[in-house]
Amino acid sequence: PDGNFVAYVAGGKPADIWYAPRYIAVISTTGGSPQFLGSDLDRNGGSPQITNDGQHVLFLLEDEGNRHLAKVPVSGGDVERVVAGERNISRFHLGSSDRLVVLESQPTYPAEISRVNDLGLTRISHVNDAHLAGIMLAPVERFTVSSADGTPIGGFLTRPPDQLNGTSLPTLLRIHGGPVSQYSTAFRFEWQLFAARGYAVVAANPRGSSGYGFAFSRAIWADWGNKDFDDVMAAVDYVIENDIADPDRLGVGGWSYGGILTNYVITKTGRFQAAITGASEVNYLSNYGTDHYQRQWEAELGLPWQNTELWIHLSPFFQVEKITTPTLVMV
C-alpha cells in the first residue's frame, strides 16, 4: 500500500516445470533481489496481498487437502495461519478498513463469504441456503492409507447419505487432473451427485499431487502410471478391505491427467467394470507439438526423436491390448 514492495508468486526453478513449488516473494519497487517468504514450509502459496500497514503478506496456502489463509512478515519470519482447519479458502479480500473476508467452502456446503474476526469466521452470505434446504448431503470422510512402498496417501470418501453404514456399495474411483493439484475439503458437487445416486466415491491424492511437498509432487517425474497407480489402488483396496466397496462393482474415471492415469489403470488391471477417460492423451508421440505443454513435455521426457523409448514406454496406447474394461473416451 505504501508502494515500497511488490508481492508476487514465484514459480520455482523452471527446470522443475509444473512440479516446482510456488512461493510467495516480495521485491522492492526500487529493484534488487527478491525475498522468498515461507519457503521452508514446502507448500504452494498463492494470491498474495500486502496488508494495509505494509508489514505482512496475506496469501493462500495449500496443505494436505486444505487451503488456508496465512500471513508472513514482509521482512521474513514465521508463517501464521489466519484461517485454518478443515476448509478450503478460494478467495479473500482485505479492505481499506482492515475488514477481512474470505470465500470459503467445506465438503458439505458450497462457497459462501465469511468475515474473519477474533472469534473465527462469521458467514455473511447465504446464497446457497435456499437451494440446500431439504437436501440431504453426504458427509465426506478423510482417510490415509499406505501405498505399496509404504508411502502414506491421503484421500476422501463420500458414501450415499442414506447408507452411511452401508456395505458392498458400488464405488467410483475419481482421479484429479494436474497432476500437480489436490482433492481438498472444498465442496464438490460431483461427489454429492454420485453419492445421491447410491455410489460411494473414493478420491485420493496420489504422488504427483500438490499440498504434500515438492518431493511428493516430483515423485512421478518421467514415471507416470507407476507410483501414482499404486497410490490410487491402495485407496481402492482400503474401501474394499473395510467392506465399504463391492469389488465387483467398481468404476474409475478422471479428466486431463486424471484421464491419463485412468488410461494407465485400465492397462494394468481389469478390476474395474467401467471407466471414463476425458481430455487425456494415449500416444504421446502423436500428441507431440499439438498442445500448449510443449516445454513441459520436452523438459520431463526429452525430445521424442532422441528419447523415443521413454515416450513409447509411457504411452498407454502401446498397452492397449491389455484393456478389458469397457471405457468411454471423452475429448
Residue ranges and their predicted role:
Residues 1, 7-25, 36-46, 60-70, ...:
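A flexible loop/linker signature enriched in serine peptidases of the S9 family
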Residues 32-39, 77-83:
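Blade-edge beta-strand/turn elements of extracellular beta-propeller
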Residues 1-6, 48-56, 92-99, 147:
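Blade-terminus and WD-like Trp-Asp/Gly-His loop motifs, strongest in beta-propeller folds
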Residues 163-169, 174-213:
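Short substrate-entry loop that stabilizes the transition state in hydrolases
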Residues 28-32, 73-77, 117-119:
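Short loop/turn segments that connect beta-strands within beta-propeller blades
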